[in-house]
Structure formats: C-alpha cells, structure tokens
Amino acid sequence: MNLSLISVLFLHLFFPLQAMAETFLPQDPGSVYDDLTGDYGVLGIASQFHVFAKEKTTINAHTEGNVATGVLSATNNFGTSISTGDLNKEINYAQSVKTIISSAETAASDKRSNKFIVGSNNVITTENDKIVVNGTKLDHLSVDEFYQDREDAQYIDFNKEFENLMLTSNMLMSLDPLKTYTPDDFPDMNNRVIDCTNLVGDQPYVINVTASVLAKNTPLRINNPQEKVLVINVVDAPTNFSVQSQIQYNKRSNHQTEDFSDANISWNFGNLTENLEINAPFQGTIIAPCTDITVNQSQDGTIIGKNVILNATTNRWDPNEFFTETNTHDDTTDTISSSTAPSTSESSTAPSTSESSTAPSTSESSTAPSTS
C-alpha cells in the first residue's frame, strides 16, 4: 500500500468528511391569506398563531405552539406536539432566523401537515434531504414542508396586521363593559372570583378589570359556565406592568391541547403599556400589539405583542372568533357578536369576508410601535 493511500485512509478515519450542503431554492409560500381562508374575527390571522410578534420572538423555554414573527431567536423547541386530529395544519413564519435548534417544530403525521416559511434574507441549503437554515439542520421538517419569501413579497405583512390590531385593541377598550372590577370588589383576597353566571345578553361579555386587580399575588378565578366569549379590558395599566395573579378559568389547568373549543377568554391590555410581564400562571389570549411581553410563568393562549420573550412553558390555545361593528359605548345597540362554534384553527375552508377590524377608536390614543 503506497504512502498516499495510507494518508487518505488516515484522514478519513480521524477526520471524517462532513456532509456537503447543497444549494436549494424553497417553494414560494404565497400569502398567508391563501392558507388561512376563514373569517377569524377582529383578531384576524393573529388568532391562528400561538405567538404573533411584530418584531422579535425569543424562545428560552419549551413552547407548545406555532410562531409568526419578524425575528426568531429560539434556543428551545417549539411546535404543537400533541396530535389528536383537531388541528390539521400548523404554520410557522419567521422573516429573519437569528437562532433555531434542530428539534424545532413537530414532525408531520397522517393527522397534521406543516408549513414553515422564512424570509428571503435567510441562507437555505439542504443536507441529507433535510433543510438547513443559516447553518442549522432542521430534523423535523421535510424539504416539501419548507418555503421562503421571494424578495418582492412577504408571507405576512406585519406592518399592516399590527395597524389593524392596534385599531382593534383601541376599539375593544371603547366598549361599554357589563361590569368593572377593582380591588374593592374582592374583600377576601384569598377568594377572588369573577362570576359570569348571571351576566345576560347575546353578545360576548365585555368586562373591565383595573390593572391593580392583576397586580395582587393571589389567584383570580373566572367562572364562565355558559362558555361565552369574554373580552377583559385591563384598564389603568402603567407603562411597565407585571401580572402577579394566577388566572384560573373554569377550573381548567394549563395544558397542551389542540382542542380550542373552550378558548373563550381574551385579555386586552391596549396600546399604552410598553412592557408587560406575566409572573403567574395565566390563561387566555393576550392582546398587546405595542408591548414588549415577557412570559415568566406558564401561559395558555395566543400572545400578540411587539416583542415576545418566553421564559416558561406556554401552550397554544387559539381563541374562538368574535366580531365587532363600528358602534362604540356611546351607542345602545349591540357592538359584538361571537361564534359559539369551536375555533376553526387553520382548518376552516370558509372564505374570509374581512381581514380584520379597521374601525378606529377614540378612547385610547394609538402610537405606532417601534421598528427598531
């Protein structure tokens, strides 16, 4: 055996060749409205994602749900792992992938397909029939499930969506509540209950809660036996606000699910709070389109914010849709209607009649979120 052959064998033994990445042009994803064709109410397509962040999502803990974000920094896994047949497709979108781990997203099955989209600025290759995003191979996604924006188009126009979400948040704040709760309504701090049993009306229940109620460190229980859609406006919140109250809803515990039929509670924090921390287990969708949201305890529901940081396990729980008219609290007519059917959650085939509410509100000033 000559010296050259021995040298080659030695190099292969101790320095095995790395698999060569191959250049790859993913499929054109089209528009989110090609995939989400239902009418999802005033929250629009945002309600079909666990996290919907205009600027950046930082995932530091297991995230049981899908993400749509400007920038993704994920040092932990994400994706809805439970599969019982209720959710037939899961979509993720990141315009710029800063960090992602190989185990991101849950592998497709005969019950669910995946669509994973990234922006045009990301470097995409393949290795052993797996997608490689900016140098990280994704083990749970096939080549056929991966898509990339073209330079002249974006799968989701976050500027447009968040303009609508800001209007929606203002409009919800303007609605006349059935009741407003302050700390004085809870004389027993260890037994704080918002009971919706005797509330009446065809429209979903709109309730105001002062931020000082959520600043207390004892549980707040929401009883909603009729499973009406609840919109809870958090009023008088400071610029920087921490939720210290555990939210208990209909004796439900935080858990993984793809059954969203009971997801009937949304918390609207408006557009004026800049920083929001969730420091106790929380249930319900968070509407805070201009806010940096940090979740430090378990949370179930959609999270809508400017920037979102997840430091604790969170679970997808898409809200049931509800719809609004342009009437404000100055009118005596109904302002909201809701669906009593389970959430459509990306499986709806009904054509959409509107993308989201565009009715402006005068009750709370709206400032454009930072793009920095």
Please place each PLM-identified region on the residue numbering:
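Intrinsic disorder/low-complexity detector
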Residues: S4, F14, G30, H329-I336
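N-terminal signal peptide
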Residues: L11-Q27
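A generic, well-ordered mixed alpha/beta core segment in the N-terminal half of proteins
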Residues: A104-K137
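Long, polar low-complexity repeats
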Residues: E22-K115, L167-N327
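Hydrophobic membrane-targeting signal helices
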Residues: F10-P16, D39, G44
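Classical eukaryotic N-terminal signal peptides for Sec-dependent ER targeting/secretion
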Residues: M1-F10
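Hydrophobic alpha-helical segments and helix pairs
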Residues: I131-P183
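Low-complexity tandem-repeat tracts in intrinsically disordered regions
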Residues: T333-S372
